[in-house]
Amino acid sequence: SFTSADEQAAFSIYDASNLNPLFDYQWSRDGLAASKSMSEKLIERNDPRLSRVFIDKDWNQMTGSADPKFLMAVNGENEEKQYFYNTSVFTYSQTAPTLFMSYHELLFLKAEALCRLNRSNEAEPVLKAACVVAIENTEVSVVAAMNAPSVVGYVGLSEKTAAITTTTAETYFETSVKPLFTATPLKEVMIQKYIAFFGASGESVEAYNDFRRMKALNENFIVLKNALN
């Protein structure tokens, strides 16, 4: 078992021609938009990632939900338009590593196991570490997007906010996550894990597996807003 993100199983040899799969798909099709339900989860928690992970149609980073160009696609009701809705910054993360097994996933699994064993006191510091490491991984992908060779060749994205520091991530946990964890430990672990998997790291399959697993257990922790599903 690894003990830091430096030891995680990452495919990290992307460059200007060997492309991150999410970037490759979006760059060739321009067919993705940012999810309103995901933005709502960030807004509800005053999550600092909100000011880092969304881009408007003119390639400007969104500073938050009050930004005049903050326009998310309503899940299941969005219009089929290009260059209209905001997109996630991750679709521009040309060189961001694909994580086969990330350090934050390992920590989230440990926190979940402890909660299921009714050992939430032990789970809390593990969840805090998971959240901090997950935010650090978000920043890796943001940096990759801001420096993406193909994107920079077309002027590039306009970065409007500062990187999230470890101190800010820890404060976020203490002020926003911890109260929710105290009230419903397992639920908040799974929601934080779901948010952490929002990115360019290829972890959506794990998020889908978690969602199926929770449904089988009649655990409706993750609320999806697409009425067509």
Label each residue range with its predicted role.
Residues 1-109, 116, 124-192, 196, ...:
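Hydrophobic-face positions in mid-chain alpha helices that act as interaction patches
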Residues 186-229:
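Extracellular low-complexity, Gly/Ser/Thr-rich intrinsically disordered linkers
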